[in-house]
Amino acid sequence: FWPFGKKQEAKFMHRYGYYEIRCRFPKNDGWWSAFWLQSPCIGAHPDPRRAGVECDIMENYRMYKHKKLICGNIWGGYGAEACGHGHFNWPFVETPDGWHHYGVHWHPNGYVFYADGQEVGRVSPDPNDARKVLDGEGSNAGFAGAVVTGPVSEVEQFILVSTECAGYRETGRHAPTLEDAILPDFFEVDFVRVFDEIP
């Protein structure tokens, strides 16, 4: 569970549309920055369409050592009833000024994820749409360009922009990579924008 402090009512709830962030990452290894959508009732109903899904638009915890970013969805809650996820990873390429755009188009027929204007993956509720792309190591886990099968949330969700110390949630583990970090270090956000879905 995430120690976000006292839970407060979401200031902005929304369903469907295009969600985008412009951000610049911390320089030190050990940070886990993310831009994501969450349902206030995830896992509370057996049908994830009604309970919502965790939609990870961008996570950078694999950026420093593996030079990759990830995106994708998790549904069914976080305990024994957790049902699955469909995540994608793609190579991280730095820009000249360090600023990046990440987004997702969430619509009734699925999710389309973007990194710096390029599509990096899709989630579709239709198993016939599934298409896996092998990475250079033969893994068939979600890779840029793949389409995975998963539920589509039909409920309003809220936006989270977060940074945490990678690994701190694991029992008995701290984040040693940050012990020698050069501070200050920042996850900078220029904007978060939401564009409505127009029928």
Task: Write out the residue ranges for each language-model feature.
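GH16 jelly-roll
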Residues: 1-199
